[in-house]
Regions:
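Sec/Tat signal peptide C-region and signal peptidase I cleavage site
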Residues: 16-22
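C-terminal capping alpha-helices of c-type cytochrome domains
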Residues: 59, 70-73, 81-101
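Gly/Gly-Pro-rich "capping" loops immediately C-terminal to redox-active cysteine motifs
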Residues: 37-67, 79-81
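Sec-dependent signal peptide recognition
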Residues: 2-10
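The canonical Cys-X-X-Cys-His
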Residues: 30-38, 93
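Short sequence/structural segments immediately N-terminal
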Residues: 22-30, 40-44, 71-75, 100-101
């Protein structure tokens, strides 16, 4: 029994954990929520529908943020918002949005 417990402790201690703190994700998402949490919100100049991000898969959100950051997706506001985000910021934000509806 001691050997099993010892093995589990070694595995847990040596396994890297990528963790997204819900509070941190919400805090980092405050700017995003202004547009992406409003049902049926339309942006102006040009007019287009802003997607609601609650419940969206985190991998998709991270991919989109990286594309805006690199200029592969075109939108001035999104490029400006994404350009200052670290990889950990993107993980925290994406995991927060995935966790809400």
């Amino acid at each position: 029994m001691k050997a099993i417990l010892k093995s589990l402790v070694i595995i847990l201690v040596s396994t890297p954990i990528i963790h997204a703190d819900e509070y941190t994700g919400r805090e980092k998402s405050e700017t995003c929520l202004g547009c992406h949490a409003i049902e049926g919100y339309n942006n102006t100049y040009p007019t287009y529908k802003v997607p609601k991000l609650g419940g969206q898969h985190s991998d998709y959100i991270i991919s989109a943020l990286k594309a805006y950051q690199k200029g592969e997706r075109k939108h001035g506001t999104m490029h400006a918002n994404a350009s200052g985000l670290s990889d950990q910021d993107m993980i925290d934000i994406a995991n927060y949005f995935e966790s809400i509806e």
